[in-house]
Amino acid sequence: MPKKNEAPASFEKALSELEQIVTRLESGDLPLEEALNEFERGVQLARQGQAKLQQAEQRVQILLSDNEDTSLPPFTPDNE
């Protein structure tokens, strides 16, 4: 497992780590301090994942903008 402040190597690894954190938090077995640390790491991973998704979306838009015949509907995240 990567160090707490280290970014995972890929989006998929970050997502996997985030899922593990959620499972541990949902178990309710963690001491308060450890749960807070896990929650903090989870927030970091979620933000990093969101940033990677936004970068991927921008790349797709750039690639599609090279082809003027292709239109891309605006992206609207479900949570907004």
UniProtKB/Swiss-Prot annotation:
It catalyses: Exonucleolytic cleavage in either 5'- to 3'- or 3'- to 5'-direction to yield nucleoside 5'-phosphates. The gene is xseB. Disulfide bonds: none annotated. Keywords: Cytoplasm, Exonuclease, Hydrolase, Nuclease. GO terms for biological process: DNA catabolic process. It is found in: Cytoplasm. It is an enzyme of class 3 (hydrolase). GO terms for molecular function: exodeoxyribonuclease VII activity. Coiled coil: none annotated. NCBIfam families: PRK00977.1-1 (NF002137), PRK00977.1-4 (NF002140), xseB (TIGR01280). Its EC number is 3.1.11.6. It comes from the Bacteria. InterPro entries: Exonuc_VII_S, Exonuc_VII_ssu_sf. Heterooligomer composed of large and small subunits. GO terms for cellular component: cytosol; exodeoxyribonuclease VII complex. Its main location: cytoplasm. This is Exodeoxyribonuclease 7 small subunit. The keyword Signal does not apply. Belongs to the XseB family. Bidirectionally degrades single-stranded DNA into large acid-insoluble oligonucleotides, which are then degraded further into small acid-soluble oligonucleotides. The keyword Ribonucleoprotein does not apply.
